[in-house]
């Protein structure tokens, strides 16, 4: 039978860490589960990525309330994935901010992604019944926008295509703190099911050029030294580059998706096999890399049905 879509042994409780990165920036991290960023301005709070459900978002709010009673006015979406955005309603924010490309992806595939992600990661959608529906941005921007939370300058930048075509980073230029979303992972496997693998390294270079002193990845610990930041950037870049090269050479040799998957697993397992969700991500990652190598620029939409078909093809 097809392997269960939910990662094996994925029901374990994850320890939450709420770490201070600067006087006004915090990271909510959970041992490789999706992270949330927090910026506290003079009179308002910004939340970057929401957690998957309103009930899960309540824990973020509880941590925020331990350090400030200022209202949460802004939610920023790093990209469109359900696990990042569907907790938004809990915050009661005035505005939900996303790139134009992210809003287009919500229109095009948000509902399908919601249904397939809930099936893939039941544990990450605790109290799924509290989700009121898709999260819709109230403000979009094409390339970048700047928000001032009093004296705190917040740059919201569509850095380029990578993890998705809508990827957005949040940069505090004075503090030199960067919230990368899933463009960077640390000790966790990049999910590439909606990725643009050939563009991703150039997008990472734009992040590197900012010279962050601290970086909050999409998954994994907050990186709080320049050395750790570079490790996060370099590790992510190495994974996506090796993945694409391994799959491309097999696709160009007209090998099947199954052959490309087996070959890529064998090549990447020694170095990356201990990263969180490696076994879970690789089928999606290889599927997208294979399509991209075959010239499919626009990632095909994942549905719950396509998930199951793909697993069956790769398990046989």
Indicate residue ranges for each PLM-predicted region:
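Divalent-metal (often Zn2+) His-rich catalytic cores of metallo-beta-lactamase-fold enzymes
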Residues: 171, 199-259, 263
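C-terminal regulatory/interaction regions
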Residues: 253-316
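Core dinuclear metal-dependent hydrolase active-site scaffold
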Residues: 140-172
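Conserved beta-strand hairpin/beta-sheet module of binuclear metal-dependent hydrolase folds
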Residues: 18-63, 168-182
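Active-site environment of divalent metal-dependent phosphoester hydrolases
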Residues: 55, 80-86, 103-106, 164-167, ...
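Divalent metal-coordination and catalytic microenvironments
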Residues: 24, 39, 49, 64, ...
């Amino acid at each position: 039978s097809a392997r269960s879509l939910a990662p094996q042994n994925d029901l374990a409780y994850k320890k939450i860490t709420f770490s201070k990165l600067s006087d006004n920036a915090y990271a909510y991290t959970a041992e490789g589960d999706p992270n949330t960023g927090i910026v506290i301005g003079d009179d308002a709070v910004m939340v970057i990525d929401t957690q998957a459900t309103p009930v899960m978002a309540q824990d973020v709010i509880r941590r925020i309330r331990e350090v400030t009673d200022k209202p949460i006015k802004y939610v920023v979406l790093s990209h469109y994935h359900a696990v990042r955005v569907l907790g938004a309603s809990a915050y009661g924010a005035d505005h939900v901010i996303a790139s134009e490309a992210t809003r287009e992806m919500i229109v095009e595939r948000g509902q399908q992604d919601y249904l397939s992600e809930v099936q893939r990661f039941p544990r990450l959608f605790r109290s799924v019944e509290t989700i009121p529906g898709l999260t819709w941005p109230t403000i979009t921007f094409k390339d970048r926008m700047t928000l001032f939370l009093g004296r705190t300058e917040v740059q919201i930048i569509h850095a380029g295509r990578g993890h998705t075509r809508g990827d957005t980073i949040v940069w505090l230029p004075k503090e030199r703190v960067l919230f990368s979303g899933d463009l960077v992972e640390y000790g966790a496997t990049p999910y590439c099911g909606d990725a643009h693998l050939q563009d991703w390294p150039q997008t990472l270079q734009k992040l590197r050029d900012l010279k962050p002193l601290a970086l909050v990845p999409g998954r994994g610990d907050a990186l709080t030294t320049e050395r750790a930041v570079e490790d996060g950037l370099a590790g992510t870049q190495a994974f996506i580059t090796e993945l694409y090269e391994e799959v491309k050479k097999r696709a160009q040799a007209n090998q099947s998706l199954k052959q490309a998957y087996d070959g890529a697993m064998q090549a990447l397992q020694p170095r990356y096999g201990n990263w969180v969700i490696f076994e879970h991500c690789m089928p999606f990652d290889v599927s997208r890399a294979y399509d991209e190598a075959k010239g499919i620029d626009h990632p095909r939409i994942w549905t719950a049905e396509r998930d199951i078909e793909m697993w069956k093809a790769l398990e046989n």
